[in-house]
Amino acid sequence: AYKYQSLAAGFMNRNADPFIVTVEPKPNDEPIHYNSHSGQEFNLVLEGRMMLSIDGKDLILNEGDSLYFNSKLPHGMKALDGKKVRFLAVIM
């Protein structure tokens, strides 16, 4: 499960939803939880490393890396190196 910290919950009529997301490390054989939702998503890794799987394609993102993608596609994240990963996610 991912932990979400909303950065704009009190802002009325917003066009984007920014979150700090924390993903704890899991056993390597545990499957990734996939999600999809309307719109687009921007992710910026703040701490750690993660594998981001989008529509069956796996990408490794390191601290400082970012990605912008169509969030209608099934996507899921996994922390790497046995350490948690924290990233900024902006959903539009």
PLM feature segments, named:
Residues 1-33, 40:
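A short glycine-rich, His/Asp/Glu-containing loop-to-beta-strand
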Residues 11, 34-35, 42, 58-59, ...:
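Short secondary-structure boundary/capping segments
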Residues 7, 55-71:
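Short acidic-glycine-tyrosine-enriched beta hairpin
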Residues 2, 14, 62, 71-92:
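Ligand-binding loop in jelly-roll beta-barrel domains
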Residues 6, 32, 49, 59-62, ...:
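Jelly-roll (double-stranded beta-helix
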Residues 22-26, 55, 90-92:
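Solvent-exposed residues in well-ordered beta-strands and their adjoining turns
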Residues 38-55, 64:
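Glycine- and acidic-residue-biased ligand/ion/polar-headgroup-sensing regions
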